[in-house]
Structure formats: C-alpha cells, structure tokens
A protein has these predicted regions:
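Catalytic cores of phosphodiester-bond hydrolases, prominently lipid phosphodiesterases
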Residues: 1-155
Length: 155
C-alpha cells in the first residue's frame, strides 16, 4: 500500500521507506512510503525545530533531525517534538535523537550518553503516540520506556 499502515497491518512485516527522490519510468509506481523533508543540518536555534512535510503527497509528516545542535539545544528540540506529538493525532512524527554537535565532544556516542540520560528521565506517557523516536546507542531501559508508551495506562 502507498499509505501509512497501522501497527496491526505491519506486525511481522517490513515497511519500505525512502527519503531520496526516485525518478521512475513511465508506468511504474513508487513502492513504500516516501518521507521527504528539507535538510536540518544548520545550527540555527529555532523555537520550532521541526520541519513539516508530507508522506506520499498525502499525510502530514513532522521531522526533528537537528543533527548539528549541541547537547542542550538538541535535548530542547527532542522535547519540543515529543511534546508536539502528544497534541497531534493526524500527524506522523520522526524524532531523531542523534547529533554530531559542534564537534567538541568528538563522537556521537559521547553526545548520546547525555541525551539518553535525559530521555530516561523524560515524562513518557502511556497510551501516547510519539511517532518514531530514533535513538543512538539506546540502552535497554530507554527502549523499554518508549515501547511501554504503546499501551494504555492501567485503570
């Protein structure tokens, strides 16, 4: 299908997603989901660090991929995207937690240590659709916290 599937529809299956522009010959149809968004590699700090786009020219896509922000600015960008996703049921979110920062630390794994500590302490809400959160060097405890948001809170 050329639309965003539900989790139930894709359980146990692969979903193809691309970001490159595939010029197809006449008569061929694009396969999978096309995620196109503008590069976010500049270091300009923005009140809204996300970029809005569309998936397959139909569904709204919101992406946070500020990969050159320093740790504190990156954490703010991640939180902004997570908080915005709570209020937008009709938008698909991609939230990249990775950064290469200013290069002062030297390796993305060092940045990830700081960001992952913050992610662990974030107020994750059960039953909330955060979209896809892409985490570098994620320890099991963070993966579990994010995974648990897929379930409704106990009554």
């Amino acid at each position: 299908k050329n639309e965003i599937p539900t989790l139930g529809e894709v359980r146990g299956k692969a979903v193809l997603a691309t970001r490159f522009d595939d010029k197809l010959p006449v008569g061929f149809e694009r396969c999978g989901l096309y995620f196109g968004w503008a590069d976010q590699g500049d270091r300009t700090i923005r009140a809204d660090p996300t970029a809005d786009s569309v998936i397959n020219d139909r569904e709204t896509l919101c992406v946070q991929d500020r990969y050159n922000y320093d740790v504190d600015d990156k954490i703010t960008a991640i939180h902004t995207c997570l908080d915005n996703s709570r209020a937008a049921d009709d938008t698909f979110f991609l939230n990249f937690t990775s950064t290469s920062g200013s290069g002062k630390v030297g390796h993305p794994k060092e940045y990830a240590k700081h960001i992952n500590l913050d992610l662990y302490d974030y107020d994750w809400q059960a039953g909330t659709a955060y979209g896809i959160v892409i985490v570098d060097f994620a320890p099991k405890k963070i993966a579990e916290k994010i995974y648990q948001t897929n379930f409704q809170p106990a009554q």
